[in-house]
């Protein structure tokens, strides 16, 4: 890309069935960043963990398909998300019709997100997603849900806008994100094209931690003292203070 201007599954089911009868995590919630190629294959582990942290299979899951709206792919992408989470056992999954800045200020959509326990931002057009959600009632509601224990998750563009900064490859520019994770920028699809962004971004924003996340891989801040854990098929690569560190599934780290 040139534009730089008892199985583990059974154990999860047992834990989720138990957690569905309990209240969700009190206080600040959890964040899940995924590197792309969501809704299939080896993404089962991070997504099941997110459902567990959200309170179990009965937890309300709300999918935000905004990033797929510019090329009219939002309905297909949203339906893929619904089918995926239902295949994992989730009972209450809806793709919200948040496709524009006007819809981002719709009070009914905002209330649906405020009541959610897992909010999932799909991939697609990064800058469109960031600009649509920025300073909106919908995003304010999502943050309220997070402060009350919900999980906010994002894949590819969805993960990118969750950080303080994101890179828009179509314009070759760095923009301010939604800042759930300060001093960071996600490099999605790191094992395919995302790693190619790293050299110039390190020069452009040297004080920002770059989070290179492979496809079919997620990182969740579910460890003690908000430590991050790696789930899924690939690796997470941290570019921080001039160092490059690679973490495997099962590894724990801080940012």
Explain the meaning of each model-derived region.
Residues 68-123, 128:
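Portal/gating segments that form or line small-molecule/metal binding sites
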Residues 61, 119, 156, 186, ...:
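A residue-level signal for conserved active-site and pocket-lining positions in enzyme catalytic cores
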Residues 18-57, 67-79, 83-87, 168, ...:
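C-terminal and late-domain segments of enzyme folds
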Residues 4, 11-14:
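Short hydrophobic targeting helices and cationic amphipathic motifs
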Residues 28, 56-61, 116, 149:
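A general structural motif
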Residues 122, 128-195:
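Class I SAM-dependent methyltransferase SAM-binding "motif I" and its flanking Rossmann-like core
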Residues 33, 94-95, 120-121, 152-155, ...:
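General beta-strand structural signal in soluble alpha/beta enzymes
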């Amino acid at each position: 890309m040139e534009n730089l201007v008892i199985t583990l599954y059974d154990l999860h089911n047992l834990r989720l069935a138990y957690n569905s009868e309990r209240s969700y995590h009190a206080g600040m919630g959890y964040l899940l960043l995924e590197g792309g190629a969501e809704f299939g294959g080896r993404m089962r582990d991070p997504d099941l963990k997110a459902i567990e942290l959200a309170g179990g299979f009965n937890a309300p899951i709300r999918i935000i398909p905004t990033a797929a709206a510019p090329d009219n792919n939002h309905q297909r992408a949203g339906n893929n998300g619904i089918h995926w989470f239902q295949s994992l056992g989730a009972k209450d999954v809806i793709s919200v019709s948040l496709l524009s800045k006007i819809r981002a200020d719709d009070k009914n959509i905002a209330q649906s997100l405020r009541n959610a326990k897992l909010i999932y931002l799909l991939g697609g057009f990064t800058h469109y997603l960031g600009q649509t959600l920025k300073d909106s009632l919908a995003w304010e509601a999502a943050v309220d849900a997070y402060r009350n224990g919900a999980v906010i998750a994002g894949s590819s563009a969805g993960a990118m806008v969750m950080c303080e900064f994101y890179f828009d490859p179509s314009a070759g520019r760095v923009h301010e994100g939604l800042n759930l994770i300060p001093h960071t920028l996600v490099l999605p699809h790191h094992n395919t094209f995302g790693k190619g962004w790293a050299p110039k971004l390190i020069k452009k924003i040297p004080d920002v931690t770059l989070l290179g996340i492979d496809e079919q891989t997620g990182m969740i801040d579910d460890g003690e003292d908000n430590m991050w854990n790696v789930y899924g098929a690939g690796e997470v690569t941290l570019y921080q203070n001039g160092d490059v560190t690679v973490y495997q599934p099962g590894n724990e780290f801080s940012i």
